[in-house]
Amino acid sequence: MTSPMTSKDSKLTLAEKVWRDHVVSQGEGDQPDLIFIDLQLLHEVTSPQAFDGLRMAGRTLRHPELHLATEDHNVPTEGIHNGSLLEINDLVSRTQVETLRKNCEEFGVRLHAMGDKKQGIVHQVGPQLGATQPGMTIVCGDSHTSTHGAFGAMAFGIGTSEVEHVMATQTLSLKPFKTMAINVTGELQPGVTAKDLILAVIATIGTGGGQGHVIEYRGEAIEKLSMEARMTVCNMSIEAGARAGMIAPDETTFDYIKGREMAPTGQDWDDAVAYWKTLPTDEGAEFDTEITIDGSAITPFITWGTNPGQGLPLSSVVPSPEDFPGDNEKVAAEKALAYMGLTPGTPLRDIAIDTVFLGSCTNARMDDLRIAADILRGRSIADSVRMMVVPSSTMIKEQAEAEGLDKIFIEAGAQWRTAGCSMCLGMNPDQLTPGERCASTSNRNFEGRQGPGGRTHLVSPAVAAATAIKGTLASPADLD
């Protein structure tokens, strides 16, 4: 999109409206706009250099109250009692966490550390506190910042130099993104989740299909999703190559935010909702690209390869390189099959799994835990499988325990852990060993993502739970 016009007669998309309302200075010609940033989220991995840059330049944070930090990437998910640094065995991880604590204290940034009830994965902490709100611009040194777009926010990941720039100025210099509408018609079938939906979208448009765009997810199937399910969809927009993903705010959004710690109250709440209701895309507004997908045709979906676009319905077989039209795709398939140790023609349901990981900023919220617990209730996981359940935040962990979900997981034979990024990425003790095959509710299945030589299949919480019981990739329907 070009910089949105402010004329009342203009027909604007959701993304264009949010952009318009944050332009501090509009660039001339091909020059970027200067955009105000409402909220910057921080964690221990991508913030140290930014804080150092401020310190070396003798600067302070321009708006410390518009920053929110938590510890998530490097924290262990077992053996945590009081949040002491001594509970982190790895020296590099411990140093990064310690550095974040010192930086937040020095620069006046609100931090939720290990052992804090409000600690968790950064993309859960913002929503659960009510800090994430419609119409905001939100950034973080993390690609899955797109999660917050589920609330109608313009949320995207940035690099460390940009993190420092936001700290110093609370602005970013950016050219407007292109806009894409993905219309998901119909209703999702029973047993089909938001994770199946977004994996199907990525398989349809490819990992570069959304490059340079903000994707707005629209249609009946999207409107009927819960807030947590919407977060799952927007979370993986980056895996489709997009800069951000957004869903228009509605009553579902407002109901989720209302009453949370950082949400507006009283007249401020009424004023906020009145503004939020102006944000949905105008009738007649034009997107740079539009795609329509039949939501009712989506079935349980998984990945077979080493990028999120290499996915198929669970009912399929492992593809052959010859199934792909282009030479580059054939080579990519050959490489993926070799790394994953798969033989073309093998039914996906016959693939044996060693580990099941239910966690990450994609799928470790209450909806996800309830779905998995309902499937595991009264059942046991296969003897050949280890299952780790890692809630997305300490608040989610406590809520799940209040509902008795932890007991269901433990009685089924799963490990119930404390909050953190965990096995989503190989930056903490939770890792796969070489050749170990995992059904994971996370967002990336790159080579070595979950540990050197580890093999990852991206799945929904429902498929994860069924797979843990069967010992092979499975959906709940396979348990009947």
Curated annotation (Swiss-Prot):
List the molecular function annotations (GO) for this entry: 3-isopropylmalate dehydratase activity; 4 iron, 4 sulfur cluster binding; metal ion binding
Q: Which reaction does it catalyse?
A: (2R,3S)-3-isopropylmalate = (2S)-2-isopropylmalate
The protein's annotated pathway: Amino-acid biosynthesis; L-leucine biosynthesis; L-leucine from 3-methyl-2-oxobutanoate: step 2/4
**Chain's role:** Catalyzes the isomerization between 2-isopropylmalate and 3-isopropylmalate, via the formation of 2-isopropylmaleate.
The protein's matches in InterPro entries, at most eight in alphabetical order, are given as:
3-IsopropMal_deHydase_lsu, Acnase/IPM_dHydase_lsu_aba_1/3, Acoase/IPM_deHydtase_lsu_aba, Aconitase_4Fe-4S_BS, Aconitase_4Fe-4S_dom, IPM_dehydratase_rel_enz, IPMI_cat
Tell me which domain of life the UniProt entry assigns to the organism this sequence originates from: Bacteria
Q: Which UniProt keywords apply?
A: 4Fe-4S, Amino-acid biosynthesis, Branched-chain amino acid biosynthesis, Iron, Iron-sulfur, Leucine biosynthesis, Lyase, Metal-binding
Cofactor(s) this protein requires: [4Fe-4S] cluster
Its top-level enzyme class, in one word, is lyase
Question: Which EC number(s) does the record attach to this protein?
Answer: 4.2.1.33
Query: Per the annotation, how and in what number is the cofactor bound?
Result: Binds 1 [4Fe-4S] cluster per subunit.
Q: Quote the record's binding site residues for [4Fe-4S] cluster.
A: C361, C421, C424
User: Which species does this protein come from?
Assistant: Corynebacterium diphtheriae (strain ATCC 700971 / NCTC 13129 / Biotype gravis)
Q: What is annotated about its quaternary structure and interactions? A: Heterodimer of LeuC and LeuD.
Family per similarity comment: Belongs to the aconitase/IPM isomerase family. LeuC type 1 subfamily.
One GO BP annotation is: L-leucine biosynthetic process
* Official protein name in the record: 3-isopropylmalate dehydratase large subunit
